[in-house]
Amino acid sequence: MDLPQLNFNETYHWEIRADKGKFFIHDTARRTWLQLTPEEWVRQHWLHYFHFTKKRNLSALLLEKKIELNGTTKRIDLLVTEKTQPKILVECKAPHIKLTPTVFEQTARYNSVLQAEEIILSNGLQHIVADFTDGKYLFRPWEW
């Protein structure tokens, strides 16, 4: 499988295996094998970034958590918590997906439920960050 090089400063160790023509990646947090899709490749980079680089406990990293939004169930990609409080909401897209205002609006809707202090939109190549304070988003440059 040809995986794109993503825009992360660190290089991580990956456990990847093939089975019946499909590729799977081991998810450290959920302790399971997941089909390796382009979006999952990005999500796993963020998981490794927060766990191995930022030294967050795996228990503070919630992946594909269900939330209720306007009577429908949605799944967020990654929520970083601190003492069970939402801190950073990460919305992952496949590398070929552009980060558009629609992607931001989707993430902001999810955050209307969660109230995380920061959101990150990422396709693995580009990262957009916004702080959420007093009901408003303030975009800022991504800093490693």
What are these regions (language model features)?
Residues 1-118, 125-144:
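A short, conserved, highly charged catalytic patch centered on acidic carboxylates
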